[in-house]
Amino acid sequence: MQHDLHPEYSEVTIQLADGSEITTRSTMETDSYETEVDSTNHPFYTGRRQFVDTAGRVEKFNRRYGLTDDDEGDDEETEDAADE
C-alpha cells in the first residue's frame, strides 16, 4: 500500500449566505469557506425568479459577430426588393 497517496482530509466550516454555518470534512486546504449562492437563496430552491441580463449577452453576441442595429433593417429592404 502506498503512503501519502491521498490528500489530507480535514474539517472545514462552510458559512452560508444567510450566516449559518455547517461543519463538514473536505480535502480543501482552508479551514473555512463562504458561499454566495446556496439552497437558501438560489432561485431553483426558493421558487423566485431573477432577472438575467440577456440584453448584455445579446449586445456581446452582436459585437462579436459584427451585427449592428443598422444591419437589422437591411433584411426588410432586401425582401421588399425581391417582391417587386
UniProtKB/Swiss-Prot annotation:
Swiss-Prot/TrEMBL keywords: Ribonucleoprotein, Ribosomal protein, RNA-binding, rRNA-binding
GO molecular function terms listed in the Swiss-Prot or TrEMBL record: rRNA binding; structural constituent of ribosome
Keyword field contains Hydrolase: no
One cellular-component annotation, GO: ribosome
Region (Disordered): 1-41, 63-84
Family: Belongs to the bacterial ribosomal protein bL31 family. Type A subfamily.
Function noted in UniProt: Binds the 23S rRNA.
Protein name: Large ribosomal subunit protein bL31
Source organism: Salinibacter ruber (strain DSM 13855 / M31)
UniProt gene name: rpmE
